[in-house]
């Protein structure tokens, strides 16, 4: 059955003029998660031979750019860069094409050349996906979307957590067009975070006011953080528990006596 399904998508790709059966994976990802919307600017990393570029252009109708170490044969309405996504020179070329505001969507369907050693192949897949995430963080617009392929294994959950640390909503998804025996899975990140802090960060802050909900409200690098169970005038060590596009939540790890309290105690 798996072989039949694989052959079905292979023949469908040929019939519909796609360069790769992987084109159907992106179609199914988008049907499920709405990663690409009409008019979006899209950057596909590791884009050769171009199957995802064809679908991205159909879905978006806007600016679509493919980047790969290999040359990508021309696709009407699609721009390409031959370069390494880890190189700053490539990042600059991408930004020059998509604009300083960045891309709406970054995709990566790249996979390592398989060696037959699963642990090694899994590690290489995570390395590629990490490079894609680092590139995405440099070229995505605020609230932009991200989709990347990884192989499941020991390092998968750590990578998933890293994506969660940079996007509001994150899902793992296996499209029907993937082989049933394949360990590949796609991670979808929605609404890229551009906050100056991340979940798990720690700060010492003075609570100067309460928000409408009764939580403490502090500014960290101009970003609003709501702190539970505090009073105005308290000095506390907090840990960021959740980050949203425009604000974050934090829990108190330690209550610290203010210098004013210490001085009062000394005078007593």
UniProtKB/Swiss-Prot annotation:
Keywords: Cytoplasm, Methyltransferase, rRNA processing, S-adenosyl-L-methionine, Transferase. It is an enzyme of class 2 (transferase). The active site is at 149 (proton acceptor). Its EC number is 2.1.1.166. Signal peptide: none annotated. Its main location: cytoplasm. InterPro entries: NA-bd_OB-fold, RNA_methyltr_RlmE, RNA_MeTrfase_FtsJ_dom, rRNA-MeTfrase_E, SAM-dependent_MTases_sf, TRAM_dom. GO terms for cellular component: cytoplasm. Disulfide bonds: none annotated. S-adenosyl-L-methionine binds at residues 50, 52, 68, 84, 109. It catalyses: uridine(2552) in 23S rRNA + S-adenosyl-L-methionine = 2'-O-methyluridine(2552) in 23S rRNA + S-adenosyl-L-homocysteine + H(+). Gene3D superfamilies: Nucleic acid-binding proteins, Vaccinia Virus protein VP39. Residues 196-254 form the TRAM domain. One of its GO terms (molecular function) is rRNA (uridine-2'-O-)-methyltransferase activity. The keyword Isomerase does not apply. It holds the Pfam family FtsJ. It is found in: Cytoplasm. Specifically methylates the uridine in position 2552 of 23S rRNA at the 2'-O position of the ribose in the fully assembled 50S ribosomal subunit. Belongs to the class I-like SAM-binding methyltransferase superfamily. RNA methyltransferase RlmE family. This is Ribosomal RNA large subunit methyltransferase E.
